Design a protein with these regions (language model features):
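Helix-coil boundary and N-terminal low-complexity module in membrane systems
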Residues: 1-139, 151, 170, 175-205, ...
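Membrane-helix boundary elements
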Residues: 130-166
Length: 266
């Protein structure tokens, strides 16, 4: 049972049982809308260091007319790591809501935060290092593109590689909070799942990214703190739930049924 707007009746399982993914998405969104705002306010606290550092860097760029410095990316790494466990907590709560399961905003967030903090921090460390490396390579190849077509290809290849890596993150955190796997296994599976449905994954990524960009235009203002994080996350995780059900969970269910059948026979 769901707990949403007190003026609306509670949403029961039979209300969405057998529904299409789209119907389930909009039904759950309408009921969980205010809780998504609550979760967004909680999640935004852990992104404050990143917001502040990004804001400072923006001011420096306006004053000096200089591009983003390497120091910005280096200092961004610990800011990202701080948001890692909170990302796991938010992912767990939204994952449950998106697949028609119940989750409390604070208690389930806290439990997932505590249970997955190690892998989450490590993943954000990897993200920070990857961000630094991509920026260095893009600058390097961008400075020598005039020397040959090969360097131009490498320049655009780095952009493509960066986009694929970001899309992999769409799958990483849902798998961290769902399966007991080592991080290297999660990254491998995330790459495979990204490539399996690459066009559709890119559409979802672009939509979520566009919504986050709209809220970032109003940096440190109401839109970002209310819906700028959890609403795009709800879109992404709803899609990821479908992919995981289609390619992973269905096989886990089959193995579970076979195991239960063997135990019954014995």
């Amino acid at each position: 049972m769901y707990y949403g707007d007190p003026r609306k009746p509670d949403l029961k399982k039979e209300d969405v049982k057998g529904s299409s993914r789209f119907k389930l998405f909009f039904t759950v969104l309408s009921v969980r809308f205010w809780q998504l705002i609550q979760l967004n306010l909680l999640y935004a606290v852990f992104w404050l260091p990143s917001y502040i550092w990004l804001y400072i860097q923006g001011l420096l760029m306006q004053q000096t007319n200089q591009p983003v410095t390497l120091e910005f990316f280096i200092l961004m790494i610990p800011c990202l790591m701080l948001a890692g466990p909170a990302t796991a907590g938010v992912t767990y709560v939204i994952r449950n809501w998106a697949r028609d399961d119940h989750a409390w905003v604070w208690s389930d967030f806290k439990d997932a935060f505590k249970e997955n903090w190690k892998q989450s921090i490590l993943m954000m460390l990897i993200n920070g290092i990857a961000l630094l490396l991509f920026s260095v390579n893009v600058r390097f190849y961008g400075s020598i593109v005039s020397e040959g077509f090969f360097y131009l290809l490498l320049y655009y290849f780095m952009f493509i590689l960066a986009i694929i890596f970001v899309m992999m993150n769409m799958f990483v955190f849902p798998m961290i909070v769902t399966y007991r796997l080592k991080l290297r296994q999660i990254l491998r599976n995330a790459f495979i799942l990204t490539m399996v449905k690459l066009p559709l994954t890119f559409v979802v990524f672009a939509l979520a990214g566009f919504l986050m960009y709209l809220s970032l235009v109003y940096l440190l203002s109401i839109p970002f703190f209310l819906v700028g994080l959890t609403f795009p996350a709800f879109i992404v995780i709803s899609y990821v739930n479908w992919i995981l059900d289609k390619y992973i969970n269905i096989h886990l269910d089959e193995e579970k049924e076979e195991t239960e059948g063997e135990e019954t026979e014995s």
